[in-house]
C-alpha cells in the first residue's frame, strides 16, 4: 500500500465528537463489544457485495470467497479487522466515518442523562458501530477500496478520536476494508490469540461470513527417533459461520439468539422475547423476529427507517425492509428469509408484490401471537413491554383491520376499579367484571390521569359501581375512533351523547329522570336563552351526582381530545359547540331558579358553563374574564 499526496484534514461532526467522548466513559465496562461491532460491520459489507455481485459478477474480482480476518501485530500493538466486502470510496469514507447520518440524532443526545448505566443503554440503542473502536484504541486507521474500482482508488482514513480526521488517497490491491486499531497500552489483552477467539465465539459465532485468524505453523521436530514433519501456517475459521435462522431451533441456545439479536439490532441489551419460525408449503420462508426490551429513542420519528433484514434464499438483499411489518409493529427487529421472492428484488418491486403482502400478514400474525402468549404466561414481563411499546400498539386497530380483535386483546388500560395509573386492565378483564345488566364498555379520554379519574362524567358510574376505563394518552382518542366494539359489546365514551345505561337503570330511575326534565323545563329554556350560540343545547343530566354541570359532545360531534389531537397535528378544526347538562339536585342549580335579576342570572349561568368547560377541556379561551366573574360573584355572596 502506497500513499499519495492528496491528503485532507476534516473536522468531525459535532455529534460524533459527543459520541466519542460518551463512549469512552459509558461503554468501557463492556469494552469487548468493539470487536462485535466491527465484525458485524465487516459481515454487512460482505453481504452487500454478495448482493451487488448478483447483477455484476466482476465485482468479485476473481475472489468470491468472502471472509473477515483478524490480524494481530504484537510488536506494533495493532489489531486489524479486515474484510473483502463491498469497500468504500473516498466520499463514502468521509460520509460514513465523519458524520452520523441518522435522523433523531439531536433527540438522542437530549435524552442522555449523565447516568452511566442508563446512557450506555441509550448509546447501545443508537448503534455506535465503527466508533466503538475508540473504546480500546487511541488511534484508528481505515484503509478501504470499493469493489469494482482500480487499486489506485483506495482511501486511507485516520483519527485519534479527538476533533478531526485525515483522509488520503492510497493504492490498495484487494477490495474491501481494513480497520487498524492502535491499541492503548492497557488493552494488550486484545492482542492475545485465545482472548480474541473467545470474544468471536461469544459474539460472532452466528454470522454467516467466516471469521478467520492465522494459525502459526509448527517446525519439523524429532520424536522417538523419528522426524515429525511440521505443519505450515494457515488461516483458520474461528466461528461457526452458519446463518442462525437456518439452523434447527431446538439446537439453538437462548444465548445464541440473544447475541444474534444484538448483531441484527445493534442493541446492547438482550431482547424481551423472540420467535423463530420456518414455514414450508405454498410459501417457503423463515422468520426470526425479536421484540426489544426497551423502546428506541426514535420510535416516534416517522423519518427513521424501520423493518426487517431481508434475505432471499439466504442471500442478503436489504436492511430495513419495512414492507413486511406494519408501522404499529415498527419496533420489531429480525430477519426474514424467503424462497419465493426473486433475487433481484427491489423496494419498488416489494410494494405491490403478492408474496410481500402474504409475508407481511404472516409476520404480523406471528408477532401478535408471540405477544398474546407473553401476556398470558408472564404478566410482569408483558407489563414491561406495554410500558415501552403500548402507545405504538394502540395505532394497530386503525391500520390493521383484519387483526383488530387480536390487537384489542393486547391493549391495557387504567380503570376506576384500580387505585393508580398503572395500565394493567385488558378488555377481557373488563368484560369479565361487567355488572349484571351492563351491555356496554364505558371509557373516558382526558388530558391526564387525574383529569380522567376526577371527571364529573364518572359520578353516576361510581354511584352504580360501574367500571370505566381511563385514558389520557394522545393516541387514545385516535384508537377509540377505530375500536368501536369488543366481544360483541359497544365501546362508549361517557362524555358523548345521551347517557344510556340500559338495564343498569331501573324503571324508577327512568321515571325520576323524566319528572326532573319536566320540572326544570323552564330553567333549561332560560339558561339556553342566556348562553345563546355558546352552546348547542342545554338539558337536565342524570350522569352527575356531585357536580352542578358538565359539557357533553353530541353523538356526531368531534370530541375534545380529538380536537386537541388535530390541532397539535396542524389540521384545521371546525368550530365545535357542546351540550351543557345541569344537575337539578345541586344547590347551585337550585339557586339559579331563584334569581330574578337577568344580569346576575347570566353571570351565574356563564360561570357554570365555564366551570364545565374547565373540567372537560383543561382550559378556557378567556381565563381572565372567568377570574373576574368569580371575584364579582364572591363579593356579592
From Swiss-Prot:
Keyword Transcription regulation: no
GO cellular component: cytoplasm
Localization: Cytoplasm
PROSITE patterns assigned: HSP90
Region feature (A): 1-347
Record-level Gene Ontology MF annotations: ATP binding; ATP hydrolysis activity; ATP-dependent protein folding chaperone; unfolded protein binding
InterPro entries: HATPase_C_sf, Heat_shock_protein_90_CS, HSP90_C, Hsp90_fam, Hsp90_N, Ribosomal_Su5_D2-typ_SF
Annotated segments matching region B: 348-564
Superkingdom field: Bacteria
Entry keyword ATP-binding: yes
Chain residue ranges for the region called C: 565-637
Main location as per UniProt: cytoplasm
Keywords: ATP-binding, Chaperone, Cytoplasm, Nucleotide-binding, Stress response
Annotated function: Molecular chaperone. Has ATPase activity.
Subunit composition and interactions: Homodimer.
Cited PANTHER family: HEAT SHOCK PROTEIN 90 FAMILY MEMBER
Entry's family note: Belongs to the heat shock protein 90 family.
Stated name of the protein: Chaperone protein HtpG
Species in which this protein is naturally found: Aeromonas salmonicida (strain A449)
Higher taxonomy: Bacteria, Pseudomonadati, Pseudomonadota, Gammaproteobacteria, Aeromonadales
Record gene name: htpG
Amino acid at each position: 500500500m502506497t500513499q499519495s499526496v492528496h491528503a485532507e484534514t476534516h473536522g468531525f461532526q459535532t455529534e460524533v465528537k459527543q459520541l466519542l467522548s460518551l463512549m469512552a466513559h459509558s461503554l468501557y465496562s463492556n469494552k469487548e463489544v468493539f470487536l462485535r461491532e466491527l465484525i458485524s460491520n465487516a459481515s454487512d459489507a460482505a453481504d452487500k457485495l454478495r448482493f451487488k455481485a448478483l447483477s455484476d459478477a466482476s465485482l468479485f474480482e476473481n475472489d468470491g470467497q468472502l471472509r473477515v480476518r483478524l490480524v494481530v501485530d504484537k510488536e506494533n500493538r495493532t489489531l486489524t479487522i479486515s474484510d473483502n466486502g463491498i469497500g468504500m470510496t473516498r466520499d463514502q469514507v468521509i460520509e460514513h466515518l465523519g458524520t452520523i447520518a441518522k435522523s433523531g440524532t439531536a433527540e438522542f443526545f437530549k435524552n442522555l442523562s449523565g447516568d452511566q448505566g442508563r446512557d450506555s443503554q441509550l448509546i447501545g440503542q443508537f448503534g455506535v458501530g465503527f466508533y466503538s473502536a475508540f473504546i480500546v484504541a487511541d488511534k484508528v486507521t481505515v484503509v478501504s477500496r470499493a469493489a469494482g474500482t482500480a487499486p489506485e482508488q483506495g482511501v486511507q482514513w485516520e483519527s485519534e478520536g479527538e476533533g478531526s480526521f485525515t483522509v488520503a488517497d492510497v493504492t490498495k490491491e484487494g477490495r474491501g476494508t481494513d480497520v487498524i486499531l492502535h491499541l492503548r497500552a492497557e488493552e494488550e489483552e486484545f492482542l492475545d490469540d485465545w482472548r480474541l477467539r473467545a470474544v468471536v465465539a461469544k459474539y460472532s459465532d452466528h454470522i454467516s461470513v467466516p471469521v478467520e485468524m492465522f494459525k502459526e505453523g509448527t517446525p519439523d521436530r524429532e520424536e522417538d527417533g523419528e522426524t515429525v514433519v511440521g505443519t505450515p501456517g494457515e488461516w483458520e475459521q474461528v466461528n461457526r459461520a452458519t446463518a442462525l435462522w437456518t439452523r434447527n431451533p431446538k439446537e439453538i441456545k437462548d444465548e445464541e439468539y440473544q447475541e444474534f439479536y444484538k448483531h441484527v439490532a445493534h442493541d446492547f441489551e438482550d431482547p424481551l422475547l423472540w420467535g423463530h419460525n420456518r414455514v414450508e408449503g405454498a410459501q417457503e420462508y423463515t422468520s426470526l423476529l425479536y421484540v426489544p426490551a426497551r423502546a428506541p429513542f426514535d420510535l416516534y420519528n416517522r423519518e427513521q427507517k424501520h423493518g426487517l433484514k431481508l434475505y432471499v434464499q439466504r442471500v442478503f438483499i436489504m436492511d430495513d425492509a419495512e414492507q413486511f411489518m406494519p408501522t404499529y409493529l415498527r419496533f420489531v427487529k429480525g430477519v426474514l428469509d424467503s424462497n419465493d421472492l426473486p433475487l433481484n428484488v427491489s423496494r419498488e418491486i416489494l410494494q405491490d408484490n403478492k408474496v410481500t403482502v402474504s409475508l407481511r400478514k404472516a409476520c404480523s400474525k406471528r408477532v401478535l401471537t408471540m405477544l398474546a402468549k407473553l401476556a398470558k404466561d408472564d404478566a410482569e414481563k408483558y407489563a414491561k413491554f406495554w410500558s415501552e411499546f403500548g402507545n405504538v400498539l394502540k395505532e394497530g386497530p386503525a391500520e390493521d383491520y383484519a387483526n383488530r380483535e387480536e390487537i384489542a386483546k393486547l391493549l391495557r388500560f387504567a380503570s376506576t376499579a384500580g387505585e393508580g395509573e398503572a395500565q394493567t386492565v385488558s378488555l377481557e378483564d373488563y368484560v369479565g367484571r361487567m355488572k349484571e345488566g351492563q351491555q356496554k364498555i364505558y371509557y373516558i379520554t382526558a388530558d391526564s390521569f387525574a383529569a380522567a379519574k376526577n371527571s364529573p362524567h364518572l359520578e353516576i358510574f361510581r354511584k352504580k359501581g360501574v367500571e370505566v376505563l381511563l385514558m389520557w394518552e394522545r393516541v387514545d382518542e385516535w384508537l377509540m375512533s377505530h375500536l368501536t366494539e369488543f366481544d360483541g359489546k359497544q365501546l362508549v365514551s361517557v362524555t358523548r351523547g345521551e347517557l344510556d345505561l340500559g338495564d343498569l337503570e331501573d324503571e324508577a330511575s327512568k321515571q325520576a329522570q323524566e319528572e326532573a326534565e319536566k320540572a326544570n323545563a323552564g330553567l333549561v329554556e332560560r339558561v339556553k336563552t342566556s348562553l345563546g350560540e355558546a352552546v348547542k343545547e342545554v338539558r337536565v343530566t342524570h350522569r352527575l351526582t356531585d357536580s352542578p354541570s358538565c359539557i357533553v359532545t353530541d353523538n356526531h360531534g368531534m370530541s375534545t381530545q380529538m380536537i386537541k389531537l388535530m390541532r397539535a397535528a396542524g389540521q384545521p378544526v371546525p368550530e365545535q359547540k357542546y351540550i351543557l347538562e345541569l344537575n337539578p339536585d345541586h344547590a347551585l342549580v337550585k339557586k339559579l331558579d331563584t334569581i330574578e335579576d337577568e344580569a346576575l342570572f347570566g353571570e351565574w349561568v356563564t360561570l357554570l358553563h365555564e366551570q364545565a368547560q374547565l373540567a372537560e377541556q383543561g382550559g378556557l379561551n378567556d381565563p381572565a374574564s372567568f377570574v373576574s366573574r368569580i371575584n364579582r360573584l364572591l363579593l356579592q355572596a
